[in-house]
Amino acid sequence: IRKKDAPSLYKNSSGNSVTQRPSSFLKNYINGSFDGGFNIEWVLDTQGNPLKYTINQTMMRVDLPESLSPNEIFKFKIKWWYNINNRLEYGGRSGYEYFEGDGNKVYTIAQFFPRLCVYNDVEGWQNYQFWGNGEFALEFGDYQVNITVPSDHIMEATGTLQNPKEVLTKVEYKRFVASKSSFEKPIIIVDQDEVKLKESAFSKKKSTW
């Protein structure tokens, strides 16, 4: 919905939100230069063959080489990217916040990958566009996710961390293990002093969580 040609920018509504910052209003409706939205580079099957696809605003249809029967499985790969917005200027659940004092940024990343639309026995595919002020109809599923960030970053996410020894220091890992059996008193895995030390490092190395 953040692409320059997104239909959500021109939808009819009851008026401008009274909580919107003046700077946000100018950037979103007057002189906005930020171009968001997913950029799809390719869609391939597991053999590396390109699959035909059609992008319709906030949705995409992938054409399978053969019909998919109930309980059958089809695997494919998508390469995509998008620009991360300044959350304070453009709002939303996802984005970054910049701190002028030390040059650091905090990233809050949401809705960052393509999701499968719901298919049910009543309506078939749920193919309503996403307008930015509602919620998705989603299928549930299990995900295996690798997230690579600079080594001085601290990752916070849902799910179960698979490689704590690789991304945490020895002290942090010890606290991580202890936290699994401490239910009355929370254990801080990375304390405030350690956070400040990491913030000043600006590591050029990367870690994958």
What function would you assign to each model-found segment?
Residues 5-13:
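Active-site-surrounding "flap" and adjacent substrate/cofactor-binding loops of secreted or lumenal enzymes
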